[in-house]
Amino acid sequence: MRSIFENGPIEINGKNDRKLLVRKDGFSLNTGNKEINVSFDDIRYTNVTRYCNSNSSYMVMMVAKDGKNIEFDTDVTPVGGGHNILETKTILTAFAASRLGKDFPNNLNTLDIELTHSLKEKQISISNGVIKGAKNSIRIDDIHTVKCVSNGALTRFAIYAGTKKRLFNAPDFAVVCNELTAPLLEAIVTRNTGKGIDFSRGDGFE
């Protein structure tokens, strides 16, 4: 995965001495009141909330390998006439690049990383060409269709193997949309079929 962070860190400065420095292997955030230093090697997966308002701050939770949660707010200053997602997007892009690796998307069948977590599947990961959770799994070579489905608050990817008709159009596997699953599934379904993710149901506000 080509990464702009290979050329050096990206610095974002805000009001009240706020400073974010994002590197290819982690980041530091000084809010003016406290400082956070994170190495991506210590992180299992991320969760971002408060994204329903396009000009409000975000709450980023990073679940660390030691079981502790690292929580902080990003993009706390509204941006007139634009979507204030610069801090959030920069951190998530760097994290995704560190996880997917330099060879992405040519390493799909050799990736061995944790992707996310859900109540049903618990830990969801990809290893040896298989996306798997506690109850279900799917070979990436069998993936034929990926649909983005949103209700306005929660966005997930419905994953289908083959073209067979199914009851209530139930997917073979489902994962939350995040900075890892989006580029990963886009690369998989494009490689398999020449077509990317179906985003026609991705806007839950309409």
Spans of features found by a protein language model:
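A broad, low-specificity signal for short, low-complexity segments enriched in glycine/proline
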Residues: 5-8, 86-87, 118-121
